[in-house]
Amino acid sequence: MKHLLGMTTVAVAILALFACATRTCAQGTQTQTQSQQQQQPPAQEGQKPSLQNPITPAVAPVPAPVDPKEDAAYKSFFSMSPANPADVDKEIQAGEDFLKAYPASQYLQHVYSRLANAYFQKPDLAKMYEDGQKALALNGDDVSVLTLLGGTLPRGKADDPNFKDKLAQAEQYDKHALELLPTTTKPEGVTDEQFTKLKETATMTAHGGLGIALFREGKVTDAVPELEKATDGVTNPDPTDFYVLGLALASLQKYADAAKAFDGCAQLTSGLQDRCKQGASDAKAKAANQLQPPKI
């Protein structure tokens, strides 16, 4: 399993399933909007807006029908399943071509969401961030993008002049994703087993991203429970989550627990293995020399 910036490419592929990838989803949104518009009574003169009585135009605009060529291009883009870097480049090109051809498409949010994932896999993190932001501007509840950005931004370089702001964004994205995940509905074409694994991966990534963001913001005590949730009992834990958990626990002088976290990281194939082995060795040595409270 290949790890990219501490996040598995497998995890991102699973998270992409949360993105609405079929015409049915977009049509469902359009149909629901039209239904709500038909049911909404005309605004009465003198009424004041409120949650119970929002003021809306007497005749709500009806979305334009989808151009058959646009629909075909959208389907073609979402039917792509890249298996190698060349395929990822083709997927990105198809998405960019769609945006140029249909800049006002009702499918824009879904295309930006898919492109954000594709740019992560390339990897082109600047474009991932740019398209992810555009996707969230159109739908702030896109769990795929929330988790992607929330899991990736905390792993950025500290010398980025905007890094502090990105950490705050990541914290916000991960918290919102964790709010949405318990009630997220199963996408079409996904089995119950796949959906269970999908939610587990998304939840793990959100907790891990939040924990790393908190750790790098200096909120070490708050970071520990998030990183523990990201690593405890999950099927495919992220070695970076284990590693940062070890660092956090060691900084709190909980050396025995830190050694366990580093050991968890050392057992996973990644570029962090040597550092985790050393971290485990150092933590065990400090734990052995640490004064223990007297037994009662």
Predicted segments, located by residue:
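Short solvent-exposed coil/turn linkers within tandem alpha-helical repeat scaffolds
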Residues: 101-108, 135-143, 161, 182-201, ...
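Terminal, low-structured helical/coil segments at or just beyond the last alpha-helical repeat
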Residues: 34, 187-188, 200-216, 225, ...
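Structural motif corresponding to the intra-repeat A-B loop/turn of tetratricopeptide repeats
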Residues: 85, 122-123, 156-160, 164, ...
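Residue-level recognition of tetratricopeptide repeat
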Residues: 117, 151, 155-158, 212, ...
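N-terminal leader/linker segments that initiate helical-solenoid repeat arrays
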Residues: 24-110, 293-296
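TPR repeat positional signature
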Residues: 73-76, 112, 146-149, 153, ...
